[in-house]
Amino acid sequence: MAPLDPQKDALAKSYANRLPALVRLTQAGQALEFKFKGTHCAIYDVIGPAGGKVAVTLDGGAPKVVTRFDAYCTYARLSTFTVGTKLPDAVHTVRLELLPDAFDKAAILAQRKETMDQPERFADRHFLPGGLLLRGELVP
């Protein structure tokens, strides 16, 4: 999976200075997997109207579902979520998989009295990771 090209993708262009390796997972089941040696891992991503749900698996444990959409997602913006913290200083494997799960975006927006001005903008369920925040280092 190659990073989005800022010359061809408006979202990638908007965040190129902070997320030069921004990728877009668009199909359920698409996944990224990596290993790191260290004690902390978080994901730096873009959330917005097209946000979806991601299964986060650390070291083969039970997946944790993380929704990449919140009551402020009427526009795209930078965000983070933690994969693991205070981990043993060892090699860890992380898998991030886009889920097919539908969820009620209108109800989430209603928490702030927001509405879906153009429902088609909210129809997709994507995941846009662009960076790792590690206390440690990537390993092959």
Q: Model-found features: residue ranges?
A:
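Glycan-recognition surfaces in beta-rich domains, encompassing non-catalytic CBMs
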Residues: M1-P140
